[in-house]
């Protein structure tokens, strides 16, 4: 299969971010920028301005624009190390996670200091930094954690460096995506994920074509949303198909999303274990060890019990049960379907059953009982676990909806056949209509038997 490559047509989203950068920082051509007909558009050394946006965006170039630019005073190792020091000075959870593996090989700070970034990657990191301090901080956090996880896997120093570089650059593909799909608080519909799931592949192409890194770096960038059980994206790779550095970056990216919240290690531990097989057990033990290392009597302020949350848990249970029934009914119906759709439904049902087991194993099923009394003596611990488990399970149902939508996007009949199931899993209008028909939650015995 031919490897996709970067286009010499300029991506408009990248170009717009670049033009915004020219208004606050000197961005210059490191060589002549020439179109495919040989016309010089920007001379070597010339400073880019907003006035050149239309010219650059309207021509197909002889070389990619990314390889022909440099920024004066952009992101570099000094900024990265300063950001890393700030993270390590303020984040107790990250220190505890890294501290569990501190004696294995080169320190994360030394690896960060030894990273090389050419003009193109420095530009990517500079644009990332311009998205706000949290954006670069996220990249550095993922890099630090990826190195820590690579140490947990006992990877070589070179593989630890690959994991760290991939962690630093894992989201550069998002620079090429319409910002509307990345807006804070934006809830993507299942079919809209098509705009986002490509960013690991874009990142892989950028790293491959713009830097002389080992191939393991680009590969790990492409794998940072994959999961060990094959439920990730973009390739749904599983098991040994995912590289060691890729596994390290994958779990690091997930951890970075919860470590800035309250009770971060508790959240991380539950997220890692809620669906067995999503991540290597090594990573769960690393988080559990960091959690055990916390002071036993540390001050806590857990959330107050809220009986209104029981309604949300009941709705979530209905959603799981109705999704299972919908998929099973499709297999029973005497309608024509392709082998691909049949396999897709079977795979979906297996994933929903795993989520059903997670619902029960986390104890959420106890809240379905009338007068369960769980709130009476709760100091907030149960409330916290309930909230985290509900969130994690909801996200995984939406993951399945996303995968169904993307796998049927090119076949209208398949998409129409699965539209109702996709809506149930995503929590959309189809779910709301189904739930209005319910007076009592589905019974638990069969599900509990399946989970046993």
What spans do the regions from the language model cover?
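Terminal helices and disordered tails flanking the catalytic cores of nucleotide-processing hydrolases
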Residues: 1-109, 115, 264-452
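Acidic/His-rich, divalent-metal-binding segments that scaffold phosphate/diphosphate chemistry
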Residues: 66-216, 236, 299-303, 307, ...
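Amphipathic alpha-helix face/heptad-repeat signature
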Residues: 135-139, 165, 192, 199, ...
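Divalent-cation-assisted or electrostatically stabilized phosphate/pyrophosphate-binding catalytic cores
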Residues: 184-205, 230-304
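PP2C/PPM family metal-dependent serine/threonine protein phosphatase catalytic domain
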Residues: 217-235
